[in-house]
C-alpha cells in the first residue's frame, strides 16, 4: 500500500465494484455502523462487567474452599486487558493512517481524503467483538468445572463473531467508506492484539484458559 504495489489497483477495482453493486444500502450502513466505537464499546463493557463478576465469584468460591491459597488469581486481569486492547486500537491505527496516507474511495472525496489504511471501524469491531467472544468463552470454560456446557457454544460464538466482522467489512466497502484491503489490514492488526490478550491472560491471570479453544 505504501509503495503503490500491484495489489493496490486490484483492491481499488474490487472496492469500486462492491460499492456499485446491488447490495442493499440500508443493511450495509447498519453493518458499517457496528464498527463505530459508540456501538462496539458498550457491547464490550457489558461483557467485561459480566466476565469480571464471573471471575470474582469464582475467585471467592475457590478462596473459601482452599486453605493453602495456591497460585495468585488475578480475576480482574482478563476484562481489564480487554479494555486496554480496545484502547490500543486508535493508538495504533491513527499513526498508521498518517504514515501511509492512503487516499479513500471516491465516495469520501468530500471530506478528508487521505488516511484510510487501515480501517479504524474494522479494527474496532474486530477487537471489541473478538475479545468479548474470548471473555465469554473463558467464562464458559470456568463454568464447566461445575456443570457441563450445553450445546456447541464455542463453534457458535466463533462463527457469530466471524460473520459479524465480515458484515462490518462488507458494509464499509459497500458504502464506500474504505477499500477492501483497508478492512483486511485492520483484521490483521486485530489478530495481533487478540493474540497479545491471550498471551497476557495465560501468563499473568493465574487461572489458565486464555488460549483459544483447542490450541
Predicted segments, located by residue:
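Interfacial segments of alpha-helical transmembrane regions
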Residues: 46-90
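N-terminal transmembrane-helix/juxtamembrane module of multi-pass inner/ER membrane proteins
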Residues: 1-43, 98-109
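Membrane-interface helix-boundary signature
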Residues: 25-28, 76-79, 147-157
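Hydrophobic alpha-helical transmembrane segments
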Residues: 32-56, 130
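Small-polar-interrupted transmembrane alpha-helices in polytopic inner-membrane proteins
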Residues: 80-102, 155-170
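Membrane-embedded catalytic cores of phosphoryl/pyrophosphoryl-handling enzymes
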Residues: 48-49, 109-215
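Transmembrane alpha-helix boundary/anchor motif
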Residues: 5, 26, 87-95, 131, ...
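Helix-boundary and loop/linker segments of multi-pass membrane transporters
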Residues: 17-22, 68-75, 107, 147-151
